[in-house]
């Protein structure tokens, strides 16, 4: 390792190891019996022994593992500690969006269009095991710098896991409700930088705190089950939560050929020689109330909305003077993908039902039923260097049918998957989703340009 070699060179430069280079007169004064000079061969042998000893005792401290594992800070008989960072800088231009939009109830709102550069997110990860390799931990500091100065800028979280065997792992802490593919551990191996198509963003759950069970079953089948506090807890304090603890989310992911690329993500960066496929299923159900909803600017904000972007739990949501206090969210997602020779074609279907309302005043409906789909296609036009991609999604809702289209390029200057320059043009039609850390705005109509430099180690 580099640092061990450097340490060996440092020791070599110390005077007691360099005595052989003293003037011959000094050596003669000591006489044969007191001569402590080392020959070149003896000195090199000592350096080799010290380096071998340090390599054994220091283990793998300082090692770097690509793919998000980061740098090894500690490796002892009592545990390990790895440190990694995910961050990106983004230039965002929304000036070509319409300045106002009108929702399905005739209410006109003015949009705050952006044209700025942000170090949009910086996430710090600390992970390893302690006392027993089966008992692992992961803690993170998660920042949203587009909200700099607000209470929602920084989130601290993590989880504690125990592995009984590959088929059975249990844990508690902050985790994804794995309702869609983008919440099944694929991040950050996406075509886009920290951005979903609007059909995924609209239907999906988010992060919760709870218990979870996961594992790898036979025939390359993976599962995860979560029982948590709510659909989206980041930015929600414990006092706001109801006392039900009834959010349930589960997923199955099947890669028949066994290797679908890093974390089962999008894009065929690996250039598979043979056809590989992936299939997924997500189920989520949660009883939600208006007290337990995150703010509009919260990290990984996931609000239950009407398809025109109106938040279900806001006052006068349906323009009748009434409001919804509680509702039950149920969502199903199905997805499939195929990769070969640098090509990736992936699609997903979503259906969401929100019902069992508890209301104050008059609400004109007793349930919401929306569905949508998306497709993404990409090609590595220069292996390990340059990728192009296209995406389209559409939502079919009771209060509008929004859609979006994207075209983008990823350039990998060092031929490493997790350091890239991304440039993208996006078209929005009546976007029902948006918050500061993503490029969409609620009600957005028109084009958005962005370019991002992403780094993960």
Regions found by a protein language model. Give the residues of each.
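Positively charged n-region of N-terminal signal peptides that target proteins for export
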Residues: 1-5
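Flexible, surface-exposed loop regions and adjacent strand-edge segments
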Residues: 100-106, 159, 187-192, 241-245, ...
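Outer-membrane beta-barrel "beta-signal"
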Residues: 248-259, 443-457
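N-terminal periplasmic/intermembrane-space "pro-region" immediately following the signal or transit peptide
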Residues: 18-88, 220, 457
């Amino acid at each position: 390792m580099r640092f061990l070699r450097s340490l060996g060179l440092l020791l070599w430069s110390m005077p007691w190891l360099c005595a052989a280079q003293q003037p011959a007169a000094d050596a003669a004064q000591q006489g044969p019996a007191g001569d402590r000079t080392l020959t070149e061969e003896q000195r090199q042998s000592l350096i080799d022994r010290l380096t071998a000893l340090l390599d054994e005792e220091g283990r793998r401290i300082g090692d770097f593992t690509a793919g998000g594992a980061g740098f090894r800070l500690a490796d002892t008989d009592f545990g390990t500690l790895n440190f990694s960072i995910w961050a990106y800088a983004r230039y965002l231009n929304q000036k070509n969006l319409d300045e106002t939009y009108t929702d399905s109830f005739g209410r006109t709102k003015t949009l705050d269009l952006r044209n700025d550069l942000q170090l949009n997110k910086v996430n710090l990860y600390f992970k390893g095991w302690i006392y027993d390799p089966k008992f692992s931990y992961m803690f993170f500091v998660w920042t949203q710098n587009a909200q700099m100065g607000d209470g929602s800028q920084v989130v601290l979280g993590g989880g504690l896991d125990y592995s009984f065997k590959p088929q059975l792992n249990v844990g508690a802490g902050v985790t994804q409700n794995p309702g869609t593919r983008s919440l099944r551990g694929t991040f950050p191996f996406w075509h886009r930088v920290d951005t979903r198509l609007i059909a995924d963003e609209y239907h999906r759950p988010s992060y919760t705190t709870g218990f979870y069970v996961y594992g790898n079953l036979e025939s390359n089948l993976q599962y995860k089950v979560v029982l948590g506090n709510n659909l989206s807890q980041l930015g929600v304090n414990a006092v706001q939560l109801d006392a039900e603890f009834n959010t349930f989310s589960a997923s199955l992911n099947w890669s028949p050929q066994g290797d679908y690329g890093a974390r089962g993500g999008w894009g065929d960066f690996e250039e598979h020689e043979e056809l590989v496929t992936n299939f997924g299923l997500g189920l989520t159900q949660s009883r939600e109330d208006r007290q337990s909803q995150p703010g509009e600017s919260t990290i990984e904000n996931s609000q239950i909305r009407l398809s025109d972007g109106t938040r279900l739990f806001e006052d006068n949501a349906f323009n009748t003077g009434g409001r919804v206090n509680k509702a039950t969210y149920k969502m199903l997602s199905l997805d499939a993908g195929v990769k070969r020779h640098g090509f990736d074609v992936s699609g997903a279907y979503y259906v969401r039902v929100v019902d069992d309302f508890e209301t104050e005043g008059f609400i004109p409906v007793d349930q919401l039923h929306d569905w949508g789909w998306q497709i993404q296609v990409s090609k590595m036009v220069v292996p390990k260097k340059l990728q192009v991609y296209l995406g389209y999604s559409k939502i079919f809702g009771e209060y509008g049918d929004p859609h979006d289209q994207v075209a983008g390029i990823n350039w990998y200057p060092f031929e490493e998957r997790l350091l890239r320059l991304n440039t993208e043009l996006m078209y929005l039609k009546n976007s029902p989703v948006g918050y500061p850390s993503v490029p969409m705005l609620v009600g957005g109509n028109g084009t958005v340009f962005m370019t991002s430099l992403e780094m993960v180690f």
